Amino acid sequence: MKNVILTPNPYRDRNFQTVRSAIQILKDAGIQPKLCLPFEVDRNYELPKDLRFSRLDRELPNTELVICFGGDGTILHMAKAATRRGVPLLGVNIGTMGFMAELESTELEKLSMLATGEFTTEKRMMLDVTVQRNRDILFHDICLNDAVITKGVIARIVHLSVKCDGVQAMECGGDGVIVATPTGSTAYCLSAGGPIVEPEANNIIITPICAHEVGSRCIVASDRRVVTVEMVRNARRNAYVSVDGGRAFRLNLGDVVTVQKSHLETKLVRLKERSFYDVVNAKFKKV
């Protein structure tokens, strides 16, 4: 492996200390990495003059791997761009939880294993999310974790209808509904009372958020199902959909949010021999 991109979150990696160490380790292993920002920074933010940054959109088509430095949010953000190009992703945690990261910032020496091919690639299911208004598709995105349909007004509830393959699965009033992948089952979905699902499982997890109903329950559906969510006809409030914690899209009465398995899969690079349950136990001890 020779062509590698490093994408540090400048607000997490202060003075780029972690990425500087990674650059040296990779160079010593015979890899000449390119440095790119994962997103645009504030105009007033001054990048260090001794580091040369390239444009991500120019480098991504020619790379073999993206190494992302940050928390889970940064990794989720980069997963979309990398997946659309079919490029594997390796996360280095500089955040709090870092559930999706393969390495901690104290384990950078393991990056030298990339030069000798001592790694595996793990595929993760993604979801396609669209919003249809009348006959027009107004919103489309992919997600690795989840699509969240939620209320837009504090101290109010939103009434949502959820269907699987056109058949009513649940109708609930509350703060909203999470539609998650197995990867996303350990994120917001878990906080809302959803189950932990192994990432290799083929499921779509539907979890109500603070439902105002005694019988409200999570649904673990097959990944073959097409899930639709819309506000019920007597709803008096707007709702919003957000994908992997990104910018929210405002929903009107009559809009239909459709969530289904994507043909795209995120490829995560693994350098360590550990099970999913090892990760769960280790990460949640931090909380």
Task: Locate predicted features.
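ATP/NTP phosphate-donor binding region
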Residues: 1-65, 106-122, 131-141
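Short glycine-rich anion-binding loops that position phosphate/pyrophosphate groups of nucleotides
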Residues: 11, 72-74, 97, 183-185
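Short glycine/serine/threonine-rich phosphate/pyrophosphate-binding segments
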Residues: 15-16, 73-78, 186-191
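N-terminal glycine-rich "phosphate-gripper" loop used for MgATP/nucleotide binding
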Residues: 68-72, 80-81
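Short, acidic/small-residue loops that bind anionic groups at enzyme active sites
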Residues: 85-103
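Catalytic core of DAGKc-family lipid kinases
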Residues: 97-175
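ATP/nucleoside-binding phosphotransfer catalytic cores, i.e., glycine-rich phosphate-binding loops
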Residues: 143, 149, 154, 165-168, ...
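Gly/Ser/Thr-rich active-site loops/lids in small-molecule metabolic enzymes
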Residues: 170-175, 179-215
